[in-house]
Amino acid sequence: MEFRTFQKHWGAEFISNDVVRFRVWAEGQKELTLRLAENDLPMTAVGSGWFQIDVPGVTHGTEYQYVLPDGMAVPDPASRAQAGDVNGPSVVIDARRYPPGNREWAGRPWEDTVIYELHIGTFTPEGTFRAAIEKLPYLAELGITQIEVMPVSQFGGSRGWGYDGVLLYAPHAAYGTPEDFHAFIDAAHGLGLSVVLDIVLNHFGPEGNYLPVLSPAFFDAERMTPWGNGIAYETEPVRQYITEAPLFWLTEYHLDGLRFDAIDQIEDASDKHILQEIAERIREAIPGRQIHLTTEDSRNVIFLHPRDAHGATPLFTAEWNDDFHNAAHVFATGETHAYYQDFAFEPEKKLARALTEGFVYQGEVSLQTGKSRGVECHTQPPQFFVDFIQNHDQTGNRAQGERLIALAGADKTRVLLAALLLSPHIPLLFMGEEFGETNPFLFFTDFHGELAKAVREGRAKEFTGHAGHGASVPDPNDVQTFVRSKIDWNKVATDDGKTWLRFTRTLLTLRHHHIVPLLRKGVTVEGKVIRTAPGMIAVSWRFPTGTLSLAFNTGNKAVDVPALAGETLFSWPEVNEVLPPNSIVVRFADGEASL
């Protein structure tokens, strides 16, 4: 069971069978007390702001807190679990008691990946890890290979997206216990599904973050982020806390990878950037498993994604490609507000570039910011780019949380879904997308008092004067905003739901049979734009064994099919000499036939 335990510098750690060391960096305090169950035990200052105490006879499930000189009791910032919310007692967890899971499971190759992004709280009516287990066979049968779980680190309240986490090592209690999350991951592995966790290392949430009280030096007042003072990554105890969190989740929970949120907001002046250090430590510590590390970075840069002579990725594996989404969204909806203005002019050409090259912005000036954005990315193979037409951000950050199907209609959405799943980029589906879910995914929280008021007013202000949504923005703290965001599983049994599922399943079967084998070559691919016109795109990718081509039309008029060589892998609806409105055709030409 060795891989189920990870020794942290912070927190409650078993140092022998029945002795637990409690250790916390509290440089802002002169003394500290451990409240263990009913007993208050003085901790020892061991230098450089650290306090610790070794206590015999501590058992799994024992509750504890740290007590400040003024009597304030706070949770352990490195808590493995909470007895309740972020303000209450932490719980001692003996990770040695967890079963080892599937010892044979070593993960899946990245080229196989079809990502399914889900939010535990809204994925099922119950909103728990255990309830989500019941849906795993459905995902495996559909053709999903990787589940990407939105952040589960404990955050304020019971409802939230998870990006306001404050206890990085503790699964959110409203979703279940550590045992429940272990069970979810083990069940997924038993079905051949990888599990990746979205992790937030760029800020802490506004409720339940006691680090400024324990250690003001954890933050840098000179380094501002959208969420307040930045994290002082250069400080050694801070660096230990941040770098060990990813290793903890991968080791103790046997996860298959991590998605690193908004890394453009992680500013580190160290000689070695903290993200590089994290990736190197992960690769060194877990050499025998398929570990996939993806990044979200609005800068469109690739310095953390080098490739060796064999095409392997010694640091991070891939990057979310917002440019693909934004171009596809403008192409399908015609919306040009906010960041969509960068894709407003000739969106068909921008989407064609996203398909063939990856980034749309590779050094060009953004209309929104007036600054150059991005770098050339021709050195990266197609599987470097994680593409999507929907995700939690792009849906939930709309005032009304509308999904693409509600904005562009079912037919256009089907065409774009087919292009997504049959392109050589790595596709990501957002929960419910596979059966044509129309329920919104809204921004929801569970704050109270002045914080709730500030969030409510801030959300309304954000959309005031924007498409007339200001007055009607749902209150994030209203429980109905959360309830409305839950997946409607009843739709799966409807005729429309069944039609969508057949469509998605067909596409994923084709992907696994025809696209994945091309990606396993691991080579840089030549992408080519064959033709574009308003509402129409035709592109191709030349692989060593042949050429993959696709053409689609979302316009109101039929257009001639461009000259696409090879056998038809997929067409919807039937495509012969012309591309009807809202249609797509995908072809593959072997070897010499593709030249």
Predicted regions and their residues:
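The feature marks proteins involved in alpha-glucan
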Residues: 1-21, 40-117, 124-127, 138, ...
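Glycan-recognition and catalytic regions of carbohydrate-active enzymes
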Residues: 4, 8, 357-374, 429-430, ...
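Short edge beta-strand/loop segments characteristic of extracellular beta-sandwich folds
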Residues: 20-27, 550-552
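Short proline/glycine-enriched turn/loop motifs at strand-loop junctions of beta-rich domains
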Residues: 25-31, 555-557, 564-565
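C-terminal beta-strand-rich structural cap/linker in extracellular carbohydrate-active enzymes
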Residues: 26, 60-63, 575-595
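Core domains of carbohydrate- and sulfate-ester-processing enzymes
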Residues: 68-103, 191, 211-216, 220, ...
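Substrate-binding/active-site clefts of carbohydrate-active enzymes
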Residues: 83, 106-110, 119-292, 303-304, ...
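Conserved alpha/beta catalytic core and glycan-binding cleft of carbohydrate-active enzymes
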Residues: 275, 279-467
